[in-house]
């Protein structure tokens, strides 16, 4: 079984939400709901409002994503 193709996009965190969720505004001005990836949680990488992040999206649901990297 092949792994699905993920879309990677850059965005900016607009709002912090409960349960480690974030509202992220993508480069193309769409807003999505994102959560931090497991490695970011494990290493306790903090994501704050205004941070530039890399988000993985599945082609099936383009309204939710996983934050995989925080740019410095």
UniProtKB/Swiss-Prot annotation:
InterPro entries: NA-bd_OB-fold, RNA-binding_domain_S1_IF1, S1_domain, TIF_IF1
One of the record's GO molecular function terms: ribosome binding
Gene3D superfamilies named in the record: Nucleic acid-binding proteins
Coiled-coil zones: none
Localization of this protein: Cytoplasm
Keywords in alphabetical order: Cytoplasm, Initiation factor, Protein biosynthesis, RNA-binding, rRNA-binding
Gene Ontology CC annotations of this record: cytosol
Start and end residues of each S1-like domain: 1-72
HAMAP family recorded: IF_1
Complex formation: Component of the 30S ribosomal translation pre-initiation complex which assembles on the 30S ribosome in the order IF-2 and IF-3, IF-1 and N-formylmethionyl-tRNA(fMet); mRNA recruitment can occur at any time during PIC assembly.
Family: Belongs to the IF-1 family.
Function, as annotated: One of the essential components for the initiation of protein synthesis. Stabilizes the binding of IF-2 and IF-3 on the 30S subunit to which N-formylmethionyl-tRNA(fMet) subsequently binds. Helps modulate mRNA selection, yielding the 30S pre-initiation complex (PIC). Upon addition of the 50S ribosomal subunit IF-1, IF-2 and IF-3 are released leaving the mature 70S translation initiation complex.
Protein name listed in UniProt: Translation initiation factor IF-1
Organism: Rhizorhabdus wittichii (strain DSM 6014 / CCUG 31198 / JCM 15750 / NBRC 105917 / EY 4224 / RW1)
